[in-house]
Regions:
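Fe(II)/2-oxoglutarate oxygenase catalytic core
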Residues: 1-171, 175-205
Length: 205
């Protein structure tokens, strides 16, 4: 499989050896801007600063289960555009231009509520918050509704935190959770290896 390096370390000539640096990576699921996102993610810690750069996970099945009925009704059968122009650090990817109109966001279109084929449970499928857009809604309505959903879905009661030690390996179901990374001291070293399992099932509501 392809191995990606996630690191803030630079080589002797000042070139980063990996991606994402030392800043915060906001809540997201990996590569949901693709029609078939990865079904699982794997992270392996080679070097990590003590109790910094923690990774947090939010359970989207629990978040949907406890979602107020009024919000469940509002998002029923809604389709969300998942932004492909920016990475999880909020940086614009090469080949894209910045836009202030979420309705013009490039990326895959997925149901806001999907079903886990193994458990048959419904779950929120949010991707990432910035630049997302709910099809068919006025922009301000889409923004307000997404803000409400995200505020609910990322409550601490739905989350779990991985405090990394060197040698830790973590695997998760990419479509079932959101994850984010804390920023950490840029003078420390953090080197992670990441790979993913290819998605093989069309996302269903």
């Amino acid at each position: 499989p392809e191995i990606n390096v996630i690191s803030n370390v630079k080589s002797n000539n000042g070139v980063p050896i990996g991606n994402l640096g030392d800043g915060e990576a906001v809540w997201h699921a990996d590569m949901t801007y693709n029609n078939l996102p990865p079904k699982a993610g794997i992270l392996y810690a080679l070097e990590v600063p003590h109790n910094q750069g923690n990774t947090h996970f939010a359970n989207m099945a629990l978040a949907y289960e406890e979602l107020p009925q009024i919000l469940k009704d509002k998002i029923k059968d809604k389709i969300l555009i998942h932004d492909s122009a920016h990475n999880s650090a909020g940086m614009l990817r090469k080949g894209y231009t910045e836009s202030n109109d979420p309705s013009q966001t490039p990326g895959a279109k997925h149901p806001l509520v999907i079903r886990d084929p193994q458990t048959n449970k419904q779950l929120l499928f949010l991707g990432r918050r910035p630049h997302a857009y709910i099809l068919g809604m006025e922009i301000n309505q889409s923004e307000d509704l997404l803000d409400d959903i995200w505020q609910h879905a990322t409550q601490e009661k739905f989350t779990w935190t991985q405090q990394w030690d060197a040698g830790d390996l973590l695997m998760w179901k990419n479509l079932n959770v959101l994850h984010k990374r804390d920023a950490f001291d840029p003078s420390t070293r953090r080197v992670m290896h990441r790979t993913q399992l290819k998605g093989d099932v069309k996302i269903a509501s």
